[in-house]
Amino acid sequence: MNLSPNQKADVLIESLPYIKKFYNEIVVIKYGGSAMVNDELKESIIKDIVLMKYVGMHPVVVHGGGPEITNMLKVFDKESKFVDGLRVTDQATMEITEMVLLGKVCQEIVTRINQNGVRSIGICGKDGSMIKTVPKDPELGLVGGITSIDTDLIKTIIEKGYIPVISPIGCGPAGESHNINADEVAGKLAAALGAKKLMLITDVAGVLRDQHDEASLISDIKTNEIEEYIETGVIKGGMIPKISCCFDAVANGVERAHIIDGRKSHSMLLEIFTDQGVGTMITHGGDQNGNSKNNKQWKSIFNEHLWENAYSLPGR
């Protein structure tokens, strides 16, 4: 699309209030899906992240890497096993996971950011005992659930002018590595950092009223509307853990959480810097009586529906 000079000026002017609003604010980005595989989409995401830094925001990137891990397991002739959609992670699988996430995926993201003129550094949750975890389920092996996050290391990296890129690997009670769901890392990290926004880059347009019609996109959801959307089947299957992640972040102080289609070029910029935005935005809302459900009530709601159509792989 070719824009006239006046149209280009209009686009820049439209973005100005948002640049002011998010200047010097932390934005946590969960980077996954097709945008990690397609070279054009990779470059689009990286340029979005770099531009965010140049206009004064502080992007923090948490990445996935499920397809790359699966491919590497095949190279080592090791079968991928799943329980309720979660990858069973024995010691050998954990070592391969670390090799892929830290040695390949994270380094590629860091290199691409550096090549675009902004300094970046790659770390994982074990560095500085940043993300502490415990085993989620003995049947899953070294799959971890987050118990605490120490943000000092990330804040230091941000203060030095770097973009932190974080691999979803946690530190267990005995110092062992745990494979963590990247959505969970992003959501809890956003809350711990006091981020202004959480952005989940996915392979869907957002929450759809009709799963087969992207025109049915729901652009704005309040937290008090989530239960009804789950009960009526609008939010289901693979969308439930993402909504759960967004809810957890918003309930703990993050102003807005977004589910964004990473298959579309520059989708993050469109969400942040335009009036219309893209994807689905989740913001805080009380229940019908003006009160918020407590976290235990919400966890019960999410867990009740979570594995009806299990999909999510830890660390993805």
From Swiss-Prot:
Enzyme class, UniProt record, top EC level: transferase
InterPro entries found in the cross-reference section: AceGlu_kinase-like_sf, AcgluKinase_fam, ArgB, Asp/Glu/Uridylate_kinase, Glu/AcGlu_kinase, NAGK-C
Disulphide bond pairs: none
A GO CC term assigned to this protein in UniProt: cytoplasm
Residues under site feature: Transition state stabilizer: K30, K242
Chief location of this protein within or outside the cell: cytoplasm
GO MF term set: acetylglutamate kinase activity; ATP binding
Subcellular location(s) per record: Cytoplasm
Keywords: Amino-acid biosynthesis, Arginine biosynthesis, ATP-binding, Cytoplasm, Kinase, Nucleotide-binding, Transferase
Gene3D superfamilies referenced in this protein's UniProt entry, alphabetically: Acetylglutamate kinase-like (3.40.1160.10)
Highest taxon of the lineage: Bacteria
Pathway per the UniProt entry: Amino-acid biosynthesis; L-arginine biosynthesis; N(2)-acetyl-L-ornithine from L-glutamate: step 2/4
Residues that hold substrate according to the record: G65, G66, R87, N179
Catalytic function, reaction form: N-acetyl-L-glutamate + ATP = N-acetyl-L-glutamyl 5-phosphate + ADP
Any one Pfam family match given in the protein's UniProt record, by short name: AA_kinase
GO biological process: arginine biosynthetic process via ornithine; L-arginine biosynthetic process
EC number(s) per entry: 2.7.2.8
Family: Belongs to the acetylglutamate kinase family. ArgB subfamily.
NCBIfam families found in the cross-reference section: argB
Function: Catalyzes the ATP-dependent phosphorylation of N-acetyl-L-glutamate.
Protein name, entry field: Acetylglutamate kinase
